[in-house]
Amino acid sequence: MMKKIDVKILDPRIGKDFPLPTYATPGSAGLDLRACLDSAVELAPGETQLLPTGLAIHIADTDLAAVILPRSGLGHKHGVVLGNLVGLIDSDYQGQLMVSVWNRGQKSFTIEPGERIAQMVFVPVVQAEFNLVEEFDSSERGAGGFGHSGRH
């Protein structure tokens, strides 16, 4: 299913020097987001930085949201992940998409202008209304928490 999302280009290099986000393959769930930097940024071990993407989106549809996720290669090969682990973009947000990057690795890592730093996935949203109860109907699991359902 393809859904149209309004996007505003905030950095004139997007569409010229840096491509617009696209799906890499027909089966891709995420669109790559790029660092819209004027110069390279060095991330020391343990350091976080907030990087602009040069894009703003307005999802508008309250049945959708977007999540910003790490790119697997950056995390696995270089220890660079998202500083907030997952970014949530609500349907009514209209500001620039920013990416918090965190170097959890042991070596400094340099992020170049236009480098792919995260991916964005659109997800369905269900808003819940709470129904206050004194007790729950019993279930097989009950209140068993972490590790309760077994190891295998």
Swiss-Prot record:
Signal peptide: none annotated. Its cofactor is Mg(2+). Its EC number is 3.6.1.23. Substrate binds at R71, S72, G73, N84, L88, I89, D90, M98. Keywords: Hydrolase, Magnesium, Metal-binding, Nucleotide metabolism. GO terms for biological process: dUMP biosynthetic process; dUTP catabolic process. InterPro entries: dUTPase, dUTPase-like, dUTPase-like_sf, dUTPase_trimeric. The keyword Magnesium applies. The keyword Protein biosynthesis does not apply. PANTHER family: DEOXYURIDINE 5'-TRIPHOSPHATE NUCLEOTIDOHYDROLASE. HAMAP family: dUTPase_bact. Belongs to the dUTPase family. This enzyme is involved in nucleotide metabolism: it produces dUMP, the immediate precursor of thymidine nucleotides and it decreases the intracellular concentration of dUTP so that uracil cannot be incorporated into DNA. This is Deoxyuridine 5'-triphosphate nucleotidohydrolase.
